[in-house]
Amino acid sequence: MDELQPQRPAILVAGDHMIDAYYRCEASRLTPEAPLPVLKVLSSYTMPGGAGNVANNVHHLLGGVETFVTLYGEGSSSIKRRYLVDHHLAARVDNDYIAKPITPKVFTDTLESNPTIRVVLFSDYGKGALEEIEELINICIDKNIRCIVDPYATHWFEYRHATAIKCNDREYNASTWIGPHQAVIKTKGDAGIELIRNGEVTHYPTRPAQVVDVTGAGDTVLAALGVCLTRLDCTVEEAISYANRAAGVAVSKLGTYAVRKDEVPDA
């Protein structure tokens, strides 16, 4: 891993790397074994998924400037294979692998090797990389580094010291513990984003957009929050506004998509 240029504030993306594989197919007949279509693959491509998609969005939102570091769990990446017919999802096949966790020592060494890191984005998909996330968050706090968690667990006690938790409606409703002073950034699809903090809810409506595919939009939100928060004067509210606009671009694209800096509309 290359060290960052010392003058640039940087982002660390840590978590579960996955691979999103897409197969464009045609379905012209049913199989004789069951009333199911036979899919003929016409073309295919892959994109980084999970924490990899967060990092890819960070890269593009920064305009291609390499001011971020990635830290993934060691081992094979889980693969999500999506089969599309006429731009519609016909089937999905997952191969899940459990990675070795990122240890506090490796995490600390990464931060100390890259002292310009100001924000850490934890992308937790439950594939093993962030088994020790509570201790990793505490390391961020000790070093005065902002950190945002995209959660997998439903019990959020281990996330209680994070700067914020970024979740969707389903994850929020499934949570079994939320700290009374925890900042929660909840995405609500085409209804925008809510900031829940100290018992108050602030709603940030999204701009009207044609929703084509919501795949990976949460990763775009997490990346955009991190990019904005590398500025010491950036508030959580300003970061949410920027993330909302970036997500509006992501959902207008088919499949996993990394939003470019020049695609994000002005406030």
Describe each model-derived feature in a short phrase.
Residues A224-L225, T230:
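Flexible, glycine-rich loop/tail regions that form catalytic "lids" or insertion modules at the edges
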Residues M1-L30, A34, K40-V214, T230-V236, ...:
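Ribokinase/PfkB-type carbohydrate-kinase core domain
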Residues G218:
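Short basic (Lys/Arg) and small-residue
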